[in-house]
Amino acid sequence: MAQVAIIAASDSGIGKECALLLAQQGFDIGITWHSDEEGAKDTAREVVSHGVRAEIVQLDLGKLPEGAQALEKLIQRLGRIDVLVNNAGAMTKAPFLDMAFDEWRKIFTVDVDGAFLCSQIAARQMVKQGQGGRIINITSVHEHTPLPDASAYTAAKHALGGLTKAMALELVRHKILVNAVAPGAIATPMNGMDDSDVKPDAEPSIPLRRFGATYEIASLVAWLCSEGANYTTGQSLIVDGGFMLANPQFNPE
């Protein structure tokens, strides 16, 4: 039986690119979507073109714990799970003094609670299978440095980074490796861009002077799913074009 990778929010952007690269590596792919079903179907068509299976399910992490049960449906349809990529997320910006509690909770529900529940479902199945597995959390550079006027998002990404380390330490006895990938400014639909926006000198405030491509995140995820990463766990790997070396976002006014 082929190995199975489930990628949350794989209807576009980083999640879609992860699905396609893992399909090229021979994984059957579980695809989830929140609001773009057609995007998920497009991903599935491209996945199947690589000669592997694809299954689609809607995943609403704003409604927990019930929403996370969609992951169990995918595991049942695909027969197992070997890789989980927690790529779903919510984000809003507001000054700390103006942040509404409801908005705060919405971000934490999706970004932290959702990742916790999906990881728990996946890890329990991996333990049952007895063959180990990989869990990869897509965080952000703001797991490591604050995003101005985004206290909830910053705190949630820090929390997900901490969860990554805690899971890695506990699950290693089951040969389940857990890591985070922390993207910088990537050309994704969530950011109002696509890979055509990855141009030289398009963003001079980043040392590499451009936005990142979704492939540049997905290729690291794919490596973390490979035998080459058999000795890597509990890490947060930053892919940011040098942003963290020269964070330009703080404006002292």
Describe these PLM feature segments.
Residues 145, 233-253:
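Short C-terminal tail/terminal secondary-structure segment
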Residues 95-96, 103-108, 202:
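Substrate-binding pocket helix/loop in short-chain dehydrogenase/reductase
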Residues 140:
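Residue(s) in the substrate-gating loop at a strand-loop-helix junction
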Residues 11-13:
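Conserved glycine-rich cofactor-binding loop
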Residues 119, 156, 164:
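Active-site helix of classical SDR
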Residues 124, 169-170, 230:
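Alpha-helical segment proximal to the catalytic Tyr-Lys
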Residues 172, 177, 232-234:
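Short, small/polar-rich loop/turn modules that mediate ligand/substrate recognition or access, typified
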